[in-house]
UniProtKB/Swiss-Prot annotation:
Primary location class: cytoplasm
Family of the protein in this entry: Belongs to the adenylosuccinate synthetase family.
Pfam families linked: Adenylsucc_synt (PF00709)
The name this protein goes by in its record: Adenylosuccinate synthetase
Cellular component annotations (GO), alphabetically ordered: cytoplasm
GO molecular function: adenylosuccinate synthase activity; GTP binding; magnesium ion binding
Oligomeric and partner information: Homodimer.
Organism: Drosophila ananassae
Swiss-Prot/TrEMBL GO biological process terms: 'de novo' AMP biosynthetic process; IMP metabolic process
Record-listed E.C. numbers: 6.3.4.4
Binding site for substrate: V321, T322, T323, K324, R325, K326, R327
Described function: Plays an important role in the de novo pathway and in the salvage pathway of purine nucleotide biosynthesis. Catalyzes the first committed step in the biosynthesis of AMP from IMP.
C-alpha cells in the first residue's frame, strides 16, 4: 500500500470513528406490531419516566392513545403520550400533520384532567404540515363516494393533507409563523385547488385566515427546528423515546394496502419523520396485543365472527379511541408478526392485554398461512386478494382460566400464561421483555 493510500485509509477510519462517537446516546422506538390499538401509549408512559424527550414522528390526530396515570385516564391524539411526565420534553416532529384546532382542543381537555406546564415542555417542528378543515371535508367526501368499498378512514383529513404535501402545495407550520401575506397567498391557492377538484366544498377564506392569524400566535411559542434540537440532545447524551402512531400493518408501504393510513408507521417513518440517521436507533420495541384487533375495513385472516370475537371485544373493551367504532377481534397472528418484525427489526416485545384471555379454556394462535391448494406460504401476501384467499393454520394452547389482573411478577403468572408468552417468544425469535395485565402502568410486568 502506498503512503498516500495509508494516510487516506487512516483519515477515513478517524472520520468514521468520529461520526459513530458523535452521539452519546441512542434513540429507543416504540412501534405497534399489528393494526394499531396495541397499547403503545401505556408502554411509552412507562418508559417516559426514564427519558428526557418523547417524540411523535408521523400521522396526525387519526391516532388515539390512552394513558392511565395516578388513576386519571388521558386520551391523546396529537400529543405524545409521554407528555404526562412533567420531567420530559415532548416533540411533534416534521413527519406529523397537525390540525391546530384539534391540537389546542386536546390540550384544553387534558389540562382539565390535570396536565400542567405544557407550554414549557412541548416542541412542534416548523417543518410539520398543517391539516385544514377542508382536508377533513374532502376526506369524508372521498369515503362517501366509495360507498361499500370505503377504506374506513377516520375522516380527520390525514390522507388529503399528506396528498397536499406530496403534490407540493401543502403548508408547513413555519410558513404560518412567517410573512402572513405569503401564508395567505398559499392558503388561497390550496383552497382554490381543492374547490376546483371538489366543487361542493365551501370554504370561507377570509374567516379561515382570521382564525389562523390567531392560531399563529397561539402556536408560536411551541415551534422550533426539532431536527437541530434532537441532534444536539443526542450529542449531549439525552435519552430519546419515539412513539410510533398507528401500526406496522397500517403502513402506507408495508401494510394491507389500500386499507392503510397515509404515512410510514414502521421504522423508516421514525427516521424521515424526525430527521434522524439510522445509527442513532438503539432499541426497537414491538408492542403486541395478546390477540389481534382491527378498526375499519380490510382483510383480517384471524378474525372471529363468533362468540370468541364477541368475548374479546367485550372483555377488552375494544372501542376505538379516535373513531369510537367497535374493533374487530381475532386470534394472535404469528405470520403477521414475523412480517412486521422483519420490516422493523424488533429488539424486544411488550405483550399487552394478556388478562383479556383469562377466561378462555383454550387459545388459538395462527402459525401459518396456506394457499387454497394447501401449500404453505413462506412470505406475507402482498395484495389483499392474495391475503383474502389464504387459509389459516392454528396451534391450540391450553388456557389458564384464572385472573392475572393483580399479578406483578412473571413467575407468579399461571404456568399456561407463561407458556403462551414463551410460545410467542420462540416463534418470533425476539425476547418478550414486558407483559401487560391491566390498564395502568403498574400492571406491566417486567419479564426478565
Amino acid at each position: 500500500m502506498s503512503e498516500s493510500s495509508a494516510i487516506n485509509g487512516n483519515h477515513y477510519e478517524q472520520l468514521h470513528q468520529g461520526r459513530t462517537k458523535m452521539y452519546k446516546s441512542k434513540v429507543a422506538v416504540v412501534l405497534g406490531a399489528q393494526w394499531g390499538d396495541e397499547g403503545k401509549g401505556k408502554v411509552v408512559d412507562m418508559l417516559a419516566s426514564d427519558v428526557d424527550i418523547v417524540c411523535r414522528c408521523q400521522g396526525g390526530n387519526n391516532a388515539g392513545h390512552t394513558v392511565v396515570a395516578n388513576g386519571t385516564e388521558f386520551d391523546f391524539h396529537l400529543l405524545p403520550s409521554g407528555v404526562v411526565n412533567e420531567k420530559c420534553v415532548s416533540v411533534i416532529g416534521n413527519g406529523v400533520v397537525i390540525h391546530l384546532p384539534s391540537l389546542f382542543d386536546e390540550v384544553l381537555k387534558n389540562e382539565a384532567k390535570g396536565l400542567q406546564h405544557l407550554e414549557n415542555r412541548l416542541i412542534i417542528s416548523d417543518r410539520a404540515h398543517l391539516v385544514f378543515d377542508f382536508h377533513q371535508h374532502v376526506d369524508g367526501m372521498q369515503e362517501a363516494e366509495k360507498g361499500g368499498k370505503s377504506l374506513g378512514t377516520t375522516k380527520k383529513g390525514i390522507g388529503p393533507a399528506y396528498s397536499s404535501k406530496a403534490t407540493r402545495n401543502g403548508i408547513r407550520v413555519g410558513e404560518l409563523l412567517g410573512d402572513f401575506n405569503l401564508f395567505s397567498d398559499k392558503f388561497k391557492s390550496i383552497v382554490a385547488t381543492h374547490v376546483r377538484l371538489f366543487p361542493s366544498i365551501n370554504v370561507d377564506v377570509e374567516a379561515e385566515l382570521a382564525r389562523y392569524k390567531d392560531y399563529a400566535e397561539k402556536v408560536r411559542p411551541y415551534v422550533k427546528d426539532t431536527i437541530c434540537f434532537l441532534h444536539t440532545a443526542l450529542r449531549n447524551g439525552k435519552t430519546i423515546l419515539v412513539e410510533g402512531a398507528n401500526a406496522a400493518m397500517l403502513d402506507i408501504d408495508f401494510g394491507t394496502y389500500p386499507y392503510v393510513t397515509s404515512s410510514n408507521c414502521s421504522i423508516g417513518g421514525v427516521l424521515t419523520g424526525l430527521g434522524l440517521p439510522p445509527q442513532t436507533i438503539g432499541e426497537v420495541i414491538g408492542v403486541v396485543k395478546a390477540y389481534t384487533t382491527r378498526v375499519g375495513d380490510g382483510p383480517f385472516p384471524t378474525e372471529q365472527l363468533n362468540d370468541i370475537g364477541d368475548l374479546l371485544q367485550t372483555r377488552g373493551f375494544e372501542i376505538g379511541v379516535t373513531t369510537k367504532r367497535k374493533r374487530r377481534c381475532g386470534w394472535l397472528d404469528i405470520p403477521l408478526l414475523k412480517y412486521t418484525s422483519l420490516v422493523n427489526g424488533y429488539t424486544c416485545i411488550c405483550i399487552t392485554k394478556l388478562d383479556i384471555l383469562d377466561t378462555l379454556p383454550e387459545i388459538k394462535v395462527a402459525v401459518a398461512y396456506k394457499k387454497p391448494n394447501g401449500e404453505k406460504l413462506d412470505h406475507f401476501p402482498g395484495t389483499i386478494a392474495e391475503l383474502g384467499a389464504i387459509e389459516v393454520e392454528y396451534a391450540v394452547l391450553p388456557g389458564w382460566q384464572t385472573s392475572t389482573e393483580h399479578i406483578r411478577n412473571f413467575k407468579e403468572l399461571p404456568e399456561n400464561a407463561q407458556n403462551y408468552v414463551r410460545f410467542l417468544e420462540s416463534e418470533l425469535s425476539v425476547p418478550v421483555r414486558w407483559v401487560g395485565v391491566g390498564k395502568g402502568r403498574e400492571s406491566i410486568i417486567n419479564v426478565h
